[in-house]
Amino acid sequence: MRAELKRCSEARLAVNATALAALIVLMFPGNAPAQGKWVKLAPFPEPAFEIAGATVNGKIYVFGGLPSGGQTTPPGLVYEYDPGANQWTKKKPMPLPAHHIAAAEYRGKVYLFGGGIQKQAGESNWFPSDHAWEYDPAADSWKALAPMPTKRGAAVAAEVGGKIYVIGGAGLHPGAKEAALSPSQPHRSLGANEAYDPATNTWQTRSPMPTARNHAAIGAVNGKIYVLGGRVASPFIGGDASNTDVVEEYDPATGSWGALRARMLTARSGVGFGTYGGRIYLVGGEFQNRAMAGVFRDLEAYDPAANQWITLPSVPLARQGVGSAVIGNRFHVISGRLQSGGVGPGQAANYDSHDAFEITDK
């Protein structure tokens, strides 16, 4: 009898331990195991940050950004990456060089929106723009599109159902005289949500995002759009700006925003992001507060179906303002800046590193 009681007790303990382990995973999804590894690929030829990336027909295209060394003129870079050859090729530059651009692919072309521009040499490079462009990789050609209703930079874009939604960003207050954004110039984060229709070259204003922000991440999964993290108040890290961990869901079919989703494990802005297998992957980013400033190595993925986050192996080199894109099961993280915020003349804080996370658990 005592032996049977002992066996029953041990069985109950085993069951309880299993249940407890499952409960811990549910309560702390960031601790759930995940598979994958980082691989090193051909470095980016001209290190830059605040660049935009997109995938078209199995190749990556990187646009815009800011150079190293405290230079203020955006170079308007365009590069194509061929994963088969592990090689970068320079393409026709942007007609109007910009940084902090929102980009999305649709039917073999890349659509780019807004960003910060420089009107004259020596001036600020942070005039918010309403320009929209179509880049055709097959022809290596550019076409100007109908301008956005709202001038802004540091917005994000995603395509659902043949329309491209440009959401958030930073810009001037309504009615303000045209000026460059700066910490001393009154400006604001935006919840603007504007849908571009490539078929008709027209815009439609949609329901604004509840949490106005800039420098966020975005992903489209199962017909819905998710905006993750970013920066509230100012687009300039530090000062009045602060990172947010808020995740919001937009349904283009109903034109409405849903209830708040599971918050990010790490509040951050200026991240790289990409979507694969029903998950949205976020890497890197930056933060500042009164005590310190820095950049992140963290790689985390959000699963909208489960409304859960998972933690994955960190990128080898911490950085922010990267270009990012997905080809097959590889999440590419390209160039970026090694520190938070700006640098002085002659200081090179951008890096040419090109890493890809090989996803093996989806």
Model-derived segments and spans:
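Kelch-like beta-propeller repeat domains
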Residues: 30-362
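Bacterial N-terminal signal peptides
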Residues: 16-29
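Generic short amphipathic/hydrophobic targeting helices enriched at N-termini
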Residues: 11, 20-23, 311
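N-terminal secretory signal peptides that target proteins for export/translocation
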Residues: 1-13
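Residue-level detector of alpha-helix boundary/anchor positions
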Residues: 7, 21-22, 215
